[in-house]
Amino acid sequence: MYRFEFSNIDNTSQYEELIKEFLQPSQYGNEGETILSYDFRGDKNDLKRQIYRDLSKLTGMSPKWGILTGIRPVKLAAELQDRGEDPKKVLMEQYLTDETKADLVCDILEYQRAKAGKPAPDSLSIYIGIPFCPTRCLYCSFTSNQVDQDAMEPYLQALGKEIDFAGEAVKADGYKVETLYFGGGTPTSLTAEQLDRLLSRVSTAFALGGVKEYTVEAGRPDTITYEKLQVLQDHGVDRISINPQSMKQKTLDLIGRRHTVEDVYEAFEMANKAGIEVINADLIAGLPEETAEDFANSLEEIIRLGAGNITLHTLAVKRASRLKEMDENFNYRDEELREQMLTAAHERLRGRGYVPYNLYRQKHTSGNTENTGFCNDDRPGLYNIRIMEEAQSNLALGAGGISKIYFPEENRLERVANVSNYEIYIDRIDEMIDRKIKGFFGNR
């Protein structure tokens, strides 16, 4: 067991995140017999490199992301490139990143700059949250609630009030909406009539003529109907997400999805019939009891169904999830298997004409891996790119929404958060609006 001692350091959180890439929580603590002492003398990355090399020597492990513990490697590479530095060289030499990861980051950066470009100074992305799901998945810790029609109507009324306010404020501040994203939760938990009402309100509040991408997450295929898809199409939605996570029925049952593989096939068929231009599909590597063959088969089915965007996630076991309660150390099991799953998936997708367009990392992710978005036909998820590069203001409406106003002169963001509990959001909607008046609008 190890014990870490730090001197001249007030906040050790980023170093602890690096330590967790090597050691399980049960392998270090105040009672550890092997003591590793560190004294901060200037550059935090020097200290992180020392920790990385010490733990590599002691454990025999060399995590491929090196000392990077942040969730936005592509943003870092962009900043390096803008300063005239070689991102790949810096990632490998200073951040100790494996060459395969450095190449992936640089490929994505090159694609983003060629296809998405930099956002206009007056552009804005908008997120609208619907915090309801049919069920809560085994691995999930998002603030979402099981569908309750009695709760939905009061929530939609409060959300509508925030939308109406935001529409006027966006116009007054001179913003132009570039992307619009409905997330959750599962927005298609709403009825077709509720969706129509909500999207009509959005169309009235905001000028959407210049919107480049309009996404609605329809993640749970059991919530999708042709009537709902027609509503989305009628309102200009051009991208949806249908997220099976796995195409193995045993896995779906185990993780609490409560839909069938057949539901996924039917959802794709309906979406194509309705004329939705881009369908994203999420798959998760590392789900309980899945093999590399299971994951490969799921990916092949999604490719065959014609998904224009495919996002490969690595299972992230959050503290508040039921899976964490069942197995505290699940993240540390089968790390090589998850890496094998993702490596094979990347090769297969590239071989089938898909290119990686977006990447982010999460805390609590299994095996020190990452989440990567792939696209074909040059239709990347633009909203996802903008959120990760953090060079544009993002207005987030609804319970749990965290707005971010961007100050380009200083290259920094300020956050303005809504409360996460939807019942408190309803009760305090006027306060949520007031927060945006004081913290978001009028600050450009």
Show which residues each predicted segment covers:
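Radical SAM enzyme core and accessory elements
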Residues: 1-75, 79-90, 159, 373, ...
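Key residue(s) within conserved catalytic/signature motifs
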Residues: 11, 100, 107-108, 139, ...
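N-terminal [4Fe-4S]-dependent radical SAM core
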Residues: 55-65, 82-126, 173
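Canonical Radical SAM [4Fe-4S] cluster-binding loop centered on the CxxxCxxC motif
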Residues: 121-156
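Beta-strand scaffold of nucleotide-dependent catalytic cores
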Residues: 129, 241, 309-314, 385, ...
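Conserved non-cysteine loop/helix-boundary elements of the Radical SAM core domain that shape
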Residues: 144-344
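Histidine- and/or cysteine-centered catalytic micro-motif in compact active-site loops
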Residues: 315, 362, 400
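A C-terminal junction/extension of Radical SAM enzymes
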Residues: 320-397
